[in-house]
Amino acid sequence: ENNMNTYTYIHEFGHVLGSDDYYDTANKNSPLSGCDIMDYMIGDHNAYTKFNYGWLSTSRLVVAEESVTLTLEDFSKNGDSIIIANNWDDALGAYQEYYILTYYRNTGLNGGEFGYFQNDGVVMYHINASLYKEEQDGEVYYDVYNNNTDGSDQYGTLDNLIEFVETSEGNIVYTAGTS
């Protein structure tokens, strides 16, 4: 019996589009707690992944020193998200350090038993997609530090590419409700 489902195809096609697995194959770290299609093959692609693919046309950038009041629409409907950054560089796009806020709904690919959370709410991600430069045999390569799938931490950074933001009590920043 073949246990493949739509989520498996979405996950594997994510690799075709350039995404790494977000789970730690050494099982030492769970930065997304299994709550992503590229992590535990549940739900949809998260805001960082869609931003990296160029699929987020409705993202709004907020410079960290600003004080603003914003409204978030359902991320699963239109990709609405808020990017919060200190020193944003347009030339780097997704490949820098920042936060992303989304309004999560338990619908669509996130619906039912395959959803991240049972209730609707705001989710905050910390992204560290900073690039590093490597030279080998006269060729220059750029890559993203990613400890999510590297148990040996070959880059020596101990940084996760993407992770839920945690409170001082160790809980993820997730607020159920609409306000």
Model-derived regions, located:
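Extracellular hydrolytic enzyme modules, especially secreted metalloproteases
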Residues: 1-115, 130
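Non-catalytic C-terminal accessory/binding modules of secreted extracellular proteins
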Residues: 68-179
